[in-house]
């Protein structure tokens, strides 16, 4: 910051609360003849301030600043900029491998003759442990304690490693398990909106911004903080001081008018917005919300909408800072001095939105009258597939018919089940197709929003008053994103009502939303498997991809917390809530959803009485202390980690073994490559690198058994991301993956060629590598959609894949592939694997790499069958070319550090 060349004289000193603070005023650019910056979207203005502050004549030049100031909303992105976020945010599933990589870099740097303690985060890094808790116990008052005990039993080694990282690395702090979900903790506590830091004896204030190793980092856009998800590899580079190389994006303006009608929630709004934006197509673009309707949305409503930016495909879903932002900062316990600084600094910078401000210029615009939003769900397997609640029964019927068409002839429509649950009388029931077997109030998307959580509690209270009960086959759970939620539910007396419907607290973490739903009751699971029943889940999460929520639910639906409770009461997806009763009251009369749905007046009154600033202050006063189990975890010392050869959780990865000082080896053309997997459209990072349970017959399970781990202790793929041996065996191991090279199969199966032997993808990869055969993956549209899962790229690399050829990529996965030295290519001219009649049995050669690469270059791909086509290099910036040539971004950083 202090080194800014400040070519446009933007630096100025202001007084805030008796303190002199330096800022960079954007109006100085207008005075310098660069045009009126007020025409720019607020998100672009934040990027502009970042470049002005970091102008060094090398990574950020005067010309770069001029390009952003003169941003053309209609231009195809071509200007590369270097963005430096204020901080980095991590969760433990992605954070453990990030810290493993940093520890491995220290190891290699020491071998190269360097001081390992030089490998250090230069930007503040916050790591929140939230991804490890599983719903093993549910429906009991002690479920929370039991799940915490199991979490520490399974993850003690990982947690010990993270504690070492917190101690060994500067600028890193860890929020312990049992505290909350990363994005909700960020929203309620970590985010500052404006940073102030000393430089050259002066205090410099600037906008808070971040990148995070979780795609839903965008939730913080609801607070007016610029930020998005990146791969763990890119986040590590940002921590080490590397700028984020990006193309100056297009910005789609989303105009909101009106206000939500009675009965509709922020969840319904975000599902509507997700559907609209997916249909429009906003991948790689910023979305910025504006319009009079913004004023009717509370800040938690905005955070819910911003959270699902990955689901609508945008890099961000940005709400500029305004009076509502300031009100939330005060309400959530931020110091008044900080709130005053946010207001004054952003107003001086031209980054504070008011109702009188002119609308910015946008690349494209959409409009939604919030008054048109209706109660909705989304499913059965994509968040953008919104279904109006009034249409849900008919939609379920169509879904069931589609699934049944692919079932075995022996599949049944129902099965009798007897359940003998602890503390309850045995019960026998008929489990039918459409049964809701999981109902989870989960995820930061919705548990950060007091209005929908209070609604769920009031609906539970109203249901109890009518004598309704949850269906016995439903696994219920409540997993809030912060301890504040249970504080206000208890104060409102609603926790008791939820618990009477078996929605007991199971943990403060992601749980079901990321696939940690835990096992179903044995008799229910057996009935599903033995009879091929088509059962469902309802969750207040943000993703419902195939195989993600549970291996036993073939259809999964996103819904607001009160609707999750409603589906638990109904016990089935085969219901029209307007026409069909949800149950019967104590007198035998039908009860409909409208009879128990809470009014907005009741919700508002409960919010006013139950949710207080003191709850935030109390719960976040000890945010870094953690439960007793965390405090007892011992911490090893040393600048380098003491790797254990017999560890099945934390292993020294091979990524840096071949990195030597100096220039990298010359890039080579790819010759004689075989196809490891031939895939269709919308292959998610869950398909490529699942986070959930490890199947007992999988290559990863074989490895764990060979290393003395019993199946009950397998834990999840997500928890084992610190061990490359497990993760490479789990790559392409999702039980719902369909590899067209092995027709008629589901899961991580392929054929080894030319012999045609069918085997696991991992075993085929090892065989190809023994034979010296390079590999490629071929896929369709939207490859790598979903979570910002760096292991989807790391695993691809370790399986020997040199290039991936698709019709299109989701942004983060493309970046991750480059970060691991895997070449992302795209079909051109509307071609695809089908139009080219590629079977996957061909031998591929890709030329034009050795002669030199540049962004967007066309390479020639030839096959032994005589086919030839062009593929576009999806290295989009010169910096990405450099990362690829070095074999990856961290390899590039390591060589840079060795050179200095």
Regions found by a protein language model. Give the residues of each.
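Fe-S-dependent hydro-lyases/dehydratases of central metabolism
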Residues: 1-900
């Amino acid at each position: 910051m202090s080194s800014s060349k400040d070519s446009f004289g933007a630096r100025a000193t202001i007084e805030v609360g008796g303190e002199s603070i330096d800022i960079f005023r954007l109006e100085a650019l207008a005075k310098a003849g660069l045009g009126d910056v007020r025409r720019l979207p607020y998100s672009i203005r934040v990027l502009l301030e970042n470049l002005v502050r970091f102008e060094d004549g090398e990574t950020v030049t005067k010309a770069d600043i001029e390009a952003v100031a003169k941003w053309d909303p209609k231009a195809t992105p071509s200007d590369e900029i270097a963005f430096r976020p204020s901080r980095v945010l991590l969760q433990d599933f992605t954070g453990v491998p990030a810290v493993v990589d940093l520890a491995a870099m220290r190891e290699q740097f020491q071998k190269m003759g360097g001081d390992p303690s030089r490998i250090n985060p230069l930007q503040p890094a916050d790591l929140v442990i939230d991804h490890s808790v599983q719903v093993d116990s549910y429906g009991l008052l002690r479920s929370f304690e039991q799940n915490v005990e199991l979490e520490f039993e399974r993850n003690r080694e990982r947690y010990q490693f993270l504690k070492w990282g917190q101690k060994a690395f500067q600028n890193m702090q860890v929020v312990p398990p049992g505290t909350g979900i990363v994005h909700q903790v960020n929203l309620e506590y970590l985010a500052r909106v404006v940073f102030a830091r000393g430089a050259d004896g002066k205090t410099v204030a600037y906008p808070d911004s971040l990148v995070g190793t979780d795609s839903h980092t965008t939730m913080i856009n609801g607070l007016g903080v610029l930020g998005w998800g990146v791969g763990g590899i890119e986040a590590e580079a940002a921590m080490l001081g590397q700028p984020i190389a990006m193309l100056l994006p297009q910005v789609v303006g989303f105009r909101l008018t009106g206000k939500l009608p009675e009965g509709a929630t922020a969840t319904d709004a975000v599902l509507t917005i997700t559907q609209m934006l997916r249909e429009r197509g906003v991948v790689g673009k910023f979305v910025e919300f504006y319009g009079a309707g913004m004023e009717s949305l509370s800040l938690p409503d905005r955070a819910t909408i911003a959270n699902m930016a990955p689901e609508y495909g945008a890099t961000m879903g940005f709400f500029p800072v305004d009076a509502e932002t300031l009100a939330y900062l005060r309400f959530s316990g931020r110091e008044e001095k900080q709130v005053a600084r946010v207001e004054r600094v952003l107003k001086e910078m031209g980054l504070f939105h008011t109702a009188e401000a002119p609308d910015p210029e946008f690349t494209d615009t959409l409009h939604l009258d919030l008054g048109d939003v209706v109660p909705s769900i989304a499913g059965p397997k994509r968040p953008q597939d919104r279904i109006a609640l009034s249409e849900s029964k008919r939609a379920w019927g169509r879904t069931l018919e589609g699934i049944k068409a692919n079932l075995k002839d022996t599949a049944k429509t129902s099965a009798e089940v007897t359940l003998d649950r602890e503390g309850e009388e045995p019960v026998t029931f008929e489990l039918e197709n459409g049964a809701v077997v999981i109902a989870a109030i989960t995820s930061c998307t919705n548990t950060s929003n007091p209005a929908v959580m209070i609604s769920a509690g009031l609906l539970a209270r109203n249901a109890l008053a009518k004598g309704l009960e949850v269906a016995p086959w439903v696994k219920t759970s409540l997993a809030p994103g912060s301890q504040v939620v249970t504080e206000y539910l208890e104060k409102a007396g609603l926790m008791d009502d939820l618990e009477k419907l078996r929605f007991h607290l199971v943990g403060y973490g992601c749980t079901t939303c990321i696939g940690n739903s835990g096992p179903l009751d044995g008799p229910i699971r057996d009935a599903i498997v033995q009879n091929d029943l088509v059962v469902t889940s309802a969750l207040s999460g943000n993703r419902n991809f195939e195989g993600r929520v549970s291996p036993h639910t073939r259809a999964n639906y996103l819904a607001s917390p009160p609707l999750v409770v409603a589906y638990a009461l109904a016990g089935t997806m085969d219901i029209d809530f307007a026409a069909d009763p949800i149950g019967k009251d104590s007198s035998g009369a039908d009860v409909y959803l409208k009879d128990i749905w809470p009014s907005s007046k009741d919700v508002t009154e409960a919010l006013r009485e139950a949710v207080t600033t003191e709850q935030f202050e109390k719960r976040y006063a000890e945010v870094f202390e953690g439960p007793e189990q965390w405090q007892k975890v011992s911490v090893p010392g040393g600048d380098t980690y003491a790797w254990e050869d017999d560890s099945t959780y934390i292993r020294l990865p091979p990524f840096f073994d071949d990195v030597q000082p100096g220039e990298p080896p010359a890039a080579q053309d790819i010759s004689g490559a075989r196809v490891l997997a031939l895939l269709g459209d919308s292959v998610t990072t869950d398909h490529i690198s699942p986070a959930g349970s490890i199947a007992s017959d999988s290559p990863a399970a074989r490895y764990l058994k060979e290393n003395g781990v019993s199946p009950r202790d397998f834990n999840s793929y997500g928890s084992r991301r610190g061990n490359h041996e497990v993760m490479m065996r789990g790559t392409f191991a999702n039980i719902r993956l369909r590899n067209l090279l092995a027709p008629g199969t589901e899961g991580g199966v392929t054929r080894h060629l030319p012999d045609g032997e069918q085997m696991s993808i991992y075993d085929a990869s090892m065989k190809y590598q023994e034979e010296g055969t390079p590999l490629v993956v071929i896929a369709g549209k939207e490859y790598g959609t979903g979570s910002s899962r760096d292991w989807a790229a790391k695993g691809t690399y370790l399986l020997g894949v040199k290039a991936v050829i698709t019709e299109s990529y989701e942004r983060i996965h493309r970046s991750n592939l480059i970060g691991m030295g895997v070449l992302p290519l795209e079909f051109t001219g509307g071609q695809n694997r089908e139009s080219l009649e590629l079977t996957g049995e061909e031998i591929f050669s890709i030329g034009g790499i050795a002669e030199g690469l540049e962004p967007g270059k066309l390479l020639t791909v030839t096959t032994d069958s005589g086919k030839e086509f062009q593929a576009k290099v999806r290295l989009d910036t010169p910096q990405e070319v450099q990362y690829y040539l070095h074999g990856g971004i961290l390899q590039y950083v390591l060589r840079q550090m060795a050179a200095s």
